[in-house]
C-alpha cells in the first residue's frame, strides 16, 4: 500500500507526463506545418528566444541553463516541503511538465515553440499550451492556498 507521499508523487509524475506529452504533440503538429487563421486567433509558428513576452532574450543560450537551475531548485525545495507537495501535486505536475517541455524546446529548436496569437481588439503575446498550463497551475495553487488560509482563520476564530 502506498503512503500519501508516494501517491502524491505518482499523481505528480502522471500529470507531468500528460502535460509534457500533450504540449510536445501540439508543437510537433505546428512544426509540421499546421496553421490556422481567424479574426480572433491565429495559429502561427514563432520561436521565442526569451521567456514571457520575450523577456530575458538577451541571455540567449544561457537562458536554458538558468531555467534548468530554477526547475531543479524548485523541485528540491518541494521535496523538502512534503505537505505543500502532497497538497498540490497536480498543480506542480502541470507547472513542471510545461516548464520542462519549454526548456526542451530551447535545446532542440533554439527557442520555445510558440503558436497561439490572439489579436482581436489588441495584439497579445504569442504563447503555447505549456504557458497556459503554467498559468493555470500557478493560479489554482494560489487560489487553493488563499481559500485554505481563509478556512484556517475561520477555524481559529
Curated annotation (Swiss-Prot):
GO terms for biological process: proteolysis. It catalyses: Release of signal peptides from bacterial membrane prolipoproteins. Hydrolyzes -Xaa-Yaa-Zaa-|-(S,diacylglyceryl)Cys-, in which Xaa is hydrophobic (preferably Leu), and Yaa (Ala or Ser) and Zaa (Gly or Ala) have small, neutral side chains. Pathway: Protein modification; lipoprotein biosynthesis (signal peptide cleavage). Pfam families: Peptidase_A8. InterPro entries: Peptidase_A8. It is a multi-pass membrane protein. It is an enzyme of class 3 (hydrolase). It is found in: Cell inner membrane. The keyword Transmembrane applies. GO terms for molecular function: aspartic-type endopeptidase activity. Its EC number is 3.4.23.36. GO terms for cellular component: plasma membrane. Disulfide bonds: none annotated. The chain crosses the membrane at residues 10-30, 36-56, 58-78, 84-104, 122-142. The active site is at residues 114, 131. It comes from the Bacteria. Its main location: membrane. Keywords: Aspartyl protease, Cell inner membrane, Cell membrane, Hydrolase, Membrane, Protease, Transmembrane, Transmembrane helix. This protein specifically catalyzes the removal of signal peptides from prolipoproteins. PANTHER family: LIPOPROTEIN SIGNAL PEPTIDASE. Belongs to the peptidase A8 family. HAMAP family: LspA. This is Lipoprotein signal peptidase. It comes from Helicobacter pylori (strain P12).
Amino acid at each position: 500500500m502506498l503512503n500519501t507521499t508516494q501517491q502524491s508523487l505518482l499523481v505528480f509524475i502522471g500529470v507531468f507526463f500528460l502535460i509534457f506529452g500533450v504540449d510536445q504533440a501540439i508543437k510537433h503538429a505546428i512544426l509540421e506545418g499546421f496553421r490556422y487563421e481567424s479574426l480572433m486567433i491565429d495559429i502561427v509558428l514563432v520561436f521565442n528566444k526569451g521567456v514571457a513576452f520575450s523577456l530575458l532574450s538577451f541571455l540567449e543560450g544561457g537562458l536554458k541553463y538558468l531555467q534548468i537551475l530554477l526547475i531543479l531548485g524548485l523541485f528540491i525545495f518541494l521535496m523538502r516541503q512534503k505537505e505543500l507537495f502532497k497538497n498540490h501535486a497536480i498543480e506542480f505536475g502541470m507547472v513542471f511538465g510545461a516548464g520542462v517541455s519549454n526548456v526542451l524546446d530551447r535545446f532542440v529548436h533554439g527557442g520555445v515553440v510558440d503558436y497561439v496569437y490572439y489579436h482581436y481588439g489588441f495584439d497579445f503575446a504569442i504563447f503555447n499550451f505549456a504557458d497556459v498550463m503554467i498559468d493555470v497551475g500557478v493560479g489554482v495553487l494560489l487560489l487553493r492556498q488563499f481559500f485554505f488560509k481563509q478556512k484556517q482563520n475561520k477555524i481559529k476564530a
